[in-house]
């Protein structure tokens, strides 16, 4: 007990020494630095677009397995970077690439939300060998993103255009599907006719009467080919219109 008493006495002396030190009184921002409030709650009458500027989207889910190419790309990016989440009080560290990505379009990502922003970014990524921005974009996802952005950042006339673009997209998608099915049907018919002609050309005993009994004539074949070319032209026109719609929506998202 004597040994323990000596330690307790030493602790008591140290506490008295600490209490006797001159500490300055709490200042104006002491509580703000120690607590974790939303910064926009400290400012009165904030707008939705102002609150979006001071919020950071949640980080995307981390991949459990990385390919050898991804690991090779991550090797040079080993410099420590720190990202502060103002609303959630989160401090994350990562490589140079992750920090620059987190800072890019932060306000837009915060408004869209993590899932919707990830879906849009997946659609805008080009596949290997494609031009940048030529990925498969889900138009419905883009329109939902436009609606959420316009609710925070009002753009005159943008919300009125969304249902028009959605209706036009659905109509042209249905028309494109119809013409694609029609082209496939005509192509199958042409292949079947070509195969029958090859079989007939290989048979030297076919008489002219048998040839006349064939249901498709040369004129019918030319007519079918012309119809296929016309359908293919309409399909290309529809695809050009759909690309124009994608460009319009991309312009709305970039505003």
From Swiss-Prot:
- Is the keyword Membrane assigned to this protein? no
Instruction: Reply yes or no: does the keyword Acyltransferase apply.
Output: no
Q: Which GO terms describe its cellular component?
A: cytoplasm; DASH complex; kinetochore; mitotic spindle; spindle microtubule
**Quaternary structure per UniProt?**
Component of the DASH complex consisting of ASK1, DAD1, DAD2, DAD3, DAD4, DAM1, DUO1, HSK3, SPC19 and SPC34, with a stoichiometry of one copy of each subunit per complex. Multiple DASH complexes oligomerize to form a ring that encircles spindle microtubules and organizes the rod-like NDC80 complexes of the outer kinetochore of the outer kinetochore. DASH complex oligomerization strengthens microtubule attachments. On cytoplasmic microtubules, DASH complexes appear to form patches instead of rings.
Q: Which residues form a coiled coil?
A: 176-248
Q: Region Disordered: which residues?
A: 53-81
One Pfam assignment? DASH_Spc34
Its taxonomic placement starts with: Eukaryota, Fungi, Dikarya, Ascomycota, Pezizomycotina
Q: What is this protein called?
A: DASH complex subunit SPC34
């Amino acid at each position: 007990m004597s040994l323990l008493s000596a330690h307790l006495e030493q602790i008591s002396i140290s506490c008295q020494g600490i209490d006797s030190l001159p500490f300055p009184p709490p200042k104006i921002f002491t509580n703000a630095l120690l607590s974790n409030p939303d910064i926009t709650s400290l400012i009165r009458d904030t707008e939705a677009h102002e609150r979006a500027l001071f919020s950071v989207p949640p980080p995307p889910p981390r991949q459990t397995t990385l390919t050898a190419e991804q690991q090779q790309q991550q090797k040079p990016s080993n410099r420590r970077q720190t990202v502060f989440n103002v609303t959630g009080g989160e401090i994350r560290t990562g490589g140079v690439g992750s920090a620059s990505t987190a800072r890019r379009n932060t306000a837009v990502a915060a408004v869209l939300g993590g899932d919707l922003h990830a879906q849009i970014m997946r659609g805008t990524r080009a596949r290997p060998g494609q031009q940048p921005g030529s990925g498969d974009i889900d138009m419905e996802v883009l329109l939902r993103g436009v609606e959420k952005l316009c609710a925070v950042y009002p753009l005159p006339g943008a919300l009125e255009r969304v249902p028009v673009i959605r209706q036009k997209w659905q109509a042209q998608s249905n028309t494109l599907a119809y013409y694609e099915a029609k082209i496939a049907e005509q192509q199958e018919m042409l292949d079947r006719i070509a195969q029958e002609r090859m079989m007939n050309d290989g048979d030297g005993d076919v008489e002219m009467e048998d040839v006349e009994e064939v249901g498709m004539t040369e004129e019918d074949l030319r007519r079918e080919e012309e119809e296929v070319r016309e359908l293919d032209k309409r399909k290309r026109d529809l695809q050009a219109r759909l690309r124009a719609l994608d460009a319009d929506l991309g312009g709305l998202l970039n505003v």
